[in-house]
């Protein structure tokens, strides 16, 4: 599909053709998000049984959770090079193959050390997918649907989480954690098949000097040949910078600003604290008075469904509401939710809680997750794919995605330690304070990029405009 050398004018395409191609690209690439979500969700239900099987301490439990994030940071760190050399399409293929290997290795682990290694391999795959899929979608989509297409990736992440929670709930009666982990290989095989039929990114093709192929792909994706030609001309204009990556980062202040903003955005996303709910939901609900594994898993499933439905709404609102309003509202909702959840858990610690506080705790986790799903979860990935200059996009997104996974690893590897050190209330109130701080950062620094082309954002950035104004 990407090695077409004949003149595309001999192959007229209808708007229906372009719509179908855009839908296929969106769905196929977003399956990478499904894999990501499956792994986030599955460990929450599997961890109690893994802990019993291997007799794990709290520290080892944290490492079973966070070893995946360590691998993801490694995968994201090297994926800039991989994506530049192989292209976005074949980077997704490599990630899918590694996902199969990591899933099978986790299911057949005979020691905690073997499980940790398999989880790291799985993490490398997730790191590749989390880097490549949003980048690929941002480069394939037109500016008016770019946010929607990238939000589809986040929707598939949440669908994966819900599917994992359903699987965990089903297997929780038998405690079969190996089946919980091994079943993840199946969607990875589906992704391998889908990637075969994906076209290469036109921006990557143009960067490699393959302009005829780039225009052919753009004609598949855009409503008219004129739009395809105009976009290719803009891409070629942005490629006139002679340097790229690290070399450009060292000498160009504006590039450094974009890279550091992407890193800050990803750190903000993780330090909202929402992923600790995904990783440790059964433990949180145990602290909130749900005594049986089945009760904890049902409450966890409710949170997962909330995440999925809120993300579904976000898919259709992110390109209408804008990036900044979504972030400001989302951080506010998460601040309130973690504040009240901390209060509820303090009452349970003091032994003064009523049964109603158990359900209020569930309600607050649902509120937090809904706020996250409609703001930081999709919007940060959208912004990070939008703000990087083309010649430095691989490097910039490598830096931001690596920051995401390092931050993710930190929150995953410290949650149980924080519970022991400052208690459940103190832990969630810490995240309340961070979310309040992020509201201020959004006002001060974050740009609005709704309905703006990537090339226009790049021109504003490189002209030295304030970061909050580069989307204007």
Swiss-Prot record:
Transmembrane parts of this sequence: 30-50, 64-84, 92-112, 115-135, 155-175, 179-199, 258-278, 298-318, 326-346, 362-382, 405-425, 426-446
Catalytic activity, as annotated: L-arabinose(in) + H(+)(in) = L-arabinose(out) + H(+)(out); D-fucose(in) + H(+)(in) = D-fucose(out) + H(+)(out)
Cytoplasmic-facing ranges: 1-29, 85-91, 136-154, 200-257, 319-325, 383-404, 447-472
InterPro entries, alphabetized: MFS_dom, MFS_sugar_transport-like, MFS_trans_sf, Myo-inositol_Transporter, Sugar/inositol_transpt, Sugar_transporter_CS
Chief location category: membrane
Molecular function as annotated in GO: symporter activity
GO CC annotation terms, alphabetical: plasma membrane
Superkingdom of this protein's organism: Bacteria
Subcellular localization, as worded in the UniProt entry: Cell inner membrane
Membrane topology category: Multi-pass membrane protein
Pfam families listed in its UniProt record: Sugar_tr
PROSITE patterns: MFS, SUGAR_TRANSPORT_1, SUGAR_TRANSPORT_2
Regions of this protein lying in the Periplasmic compartment: 51-63, 113-114, 176-178, 279-297, 347-361
Keywords on record: Cell inner membrane, Cell membrane, Membrane, Sugar transport, Symport, Transmembrane, Transmembrane helix, Transport
Annotated family: Belongs to the major facilitator superfamily. Sugar transporter (TC 2.A.1.1) family.
Its job: Uptake of L-arabinose across the cytoplasmic membrane with the concomitant transport of protons into the cell (symport system). D-fucose, a nonmetabolizable analog of L-arabinose, is also a good substrate.
Stated name of the protein: Arabinose-proton symporter
Organism this protein belongs to: Klebsiella oxytoca
Encoding gene per record: araE
